[in-house]
Amino acid sequence: AEVTADGIKEGKDMLEGEPYECPMEPFGGIEQLTWSPDSKQVAYTCRKKTGRDYAISTDSDIYLYDTTSGKTRNLCKPAGFVAPEVDATKSMKNQSINDKSMMQYNMGYDTNPQFSPDGKYVAWQSMARDGYESDRNRLCVFNLANGEKTYVTEKFDSNVDAFCWNSDSKSFFFTGVWHGCENIYRTNLAGDVHQITEGWHDYGSIALLDKGKLLATRHSMTVPDDIYVVTPGNDKKGKEEQVTFENKHILDQLALGSVQQRWVKTTDGKEMLVWIVLPPHFDANKKYPTLLFCEGGPQSPVSQFWSYRWNMQIMAAQGYIVVAP
């Protein structure tokens, strides 16, 4: 809709006549659509399927709507693309829709588009395979001039959880979990990945401030969210400055359990990270009952999260040693 001094003019439905929704149900929000810098285009996320296909498929795409012509373009797949048939009675793993030759068509979950500041690119989070909700989220970059797609986080063997463009339109900042901690990383259009922060914590939302600084939220198993300003350094690691202390007056009155890291050899010979949360005032000479925290899904790793549903500190405060693989 056009907004003038006289008010808001009648809006245009970008999905007029189409039985779909944006943002996508059930968890989608405003992050699934974005305006171009010149305000002439809108990139949005949508899963344009119905019936059985809508029920079993995770294949969403990024669409580009032109406000002048009213035309919509799919950035993930070429015009006229028809996906292979899916046998709903069988696993999606070995079906033709997930053949390696299909990966170029972004057959998985594509979401959260962002235009580059210069308007020449659209980047989004992309999963490779259809029907696999826990697939790795990569960062896909679409060149609006030539239609080329590039995956710029292939050197990072984990999910891209949040991201933002740098002001130069040639690089990004993103968060991702590695060894049970979610830190901030930087990558460029060539796919060179460098770690910016380090430590036992999880960074959540990130946004670019002026002069290349980042505004971010951070928490851990011992501290809920606070806001930080991160200044990326030329030597890969950056400066982290805490700017809010919203719960300090409460935390100062609490005795929290210490958090430890263990690596356990699995039955197939691999090393598995396990977080240990000890009860407050832990005494190594005493015996304690153990509580095994079993992650559901699995849709996400057990990282340094602060949960308001499954809080490790509340469990440990009951006198348990919490073991979280």
Specify the residue positions occupied by each region the protein language model found.
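A flexible loop/linker signature enriched in serine peptidases of the S9 family
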Residues: 1, 15-29, 45-63, 74-111, ...
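Conserved blade-ending motifs and adjacent loop-strand segments that build the rim/top face
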Residues: 152-162, 194-206, 244-255
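Residue-level detector of Asp-centered blade-edge/turn motifs that repeat once per structural unit
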Residues: 37-38, 117-118, 167-168, 209-211
